[in-house]
Amino acid sequence: MGKAEGIEFLAKSEPWVKYKLEDKTVLFARLLITKVYRTDQYDPNGQPVYAWSSQNFFTTVAPKENKGTPSDPPPSSLNPSDYSVTPVDFERVGSEQWNIYELKDKTVLRIKLEVTGVVRTDKFAVDGDPFYIVSSGALTRMKVPSELLKKQVPKASPQKDIYK
């Protein structure tokens, strides 16, 4: 990654995204950026390259018929092979929502958590809700102020006399 420095940022929006699972449980998902770094590198478009640390959060609200006796010990592994699992279909409820962060250098980072898979385990959380394992990814978009762009110098190529 080269050299990188932490950069201050302001969280403008960090929404919970709601999903309805096929078993009638409601899943809430949220991504939080905890630190942003600006590197000394630039992408092919001349934009500074940023990196960040983030944490995903998931919580559920299950109907009574899905609840069970809390597992002892409480489930902690996120490895599906540690449990008997059932894939659960799901769909997002409401409109697409992006997290929005304004960096001190006026760059705007937009990032969206996207749930890509859900499995229900044979275990129950401390509140009696089924224990789910959620797979997810993040989509990002950056809007960099023009004054931060690095001018690209065209690479010289050997001149060929194509008009002979």
Model-derived regions: residue spans:
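Short, charged/polar N-terminal "headpieces" of proteins
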Residues: 1-22
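Linear-motif-rich, low-complexity cytosolic tails and juxtamembrane regions
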Residues: 1-7, 37-104, 108, 116-164
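Beta-strand-rich binding-surface signature
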Residues: 16, 26, 98
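Short, isolated positions in well-ordered beta-strands
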Residues: 26-27, 108-109
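Aromatic- and glycine-enriched beta-alpha-beta binding-site module
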Residues: 30-38
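A structural feature that tracks compact, well-ordered secondary-structure segments
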Residues: 31-32, 111-116
